[in-house]
Amino acid sequence: MNMIEQLEQEEAARVLGEKTIPDFSAGDTLRVHVRIKEGERERIQVFEGVCIARNGGGLNESYTVRKISFGEGVERVFPLYSPNVEQIEIKRKGKVRRAKLYYLRDRRGKSARIAERVTGRGIEKREPKKKG
């Protein structure tokens, strides 16, 4: 392991603290709890939608979540190691064959649905990929 990878691992551990990041991919329906500061007040806002992409790697990794709000498509890009993201919940696993689901931007209604990946035991537990 080179020096940069080691520094990135240490920084990721420092930023995460007690939080854990679930293993999710494109097609999964997520609930992202985001900390929002409005003046003196601070609150948690939940953004629920389909993960349509994961980008980057290391500390710079991010993911895009899309939802339909009042008939309009809304997308937010969250850094994976953001201190403003309080928690990430996986609501359901999606069965898709693509890593990037940008084609969902052009779809509405039933054609934008994603089938659920079923294992027979609820949300499937995957081991994180090992590099090397």
Curated annotation (Swiss-Prot):
Similarity-based family: Belongs to the bacterial ribosomal protein bL19 family.
Protein name: Large ribosomal subunit protein bL19
Designated gene of the protein: rplS
Organism domain of life: Bacteria
Purpose of the protein: This protein is located at the 30S-50S ribosomal subunit interface and may play a role in the structure and function of the aminoacyl-tRNA binding site.
SUPFAM superfamilies given in the database record: Translation proteins SH3-like domain
InterPro entries, A to Z: Ribosomal_bL19 (IPR001857), Ribosomal_bL19_CS (IPR018257), Ribosomal_bL19_sf (IPR038657), Translation_prot_SH3-like_sf (IPR008991)
Entry annotated with the keyword Transmembrane helix: no
A GO molecular-function descriptor: structural constituent of ribosome
GO cellular component: cytosolic large ribosomal subunit
Gene3D superfamilies per the UniProt record, alphabetical: 2.30.30.790
Keywords associated with the record: Ribonucleoprotein, Ribosomal protein
Any single biological process term in GO: translation
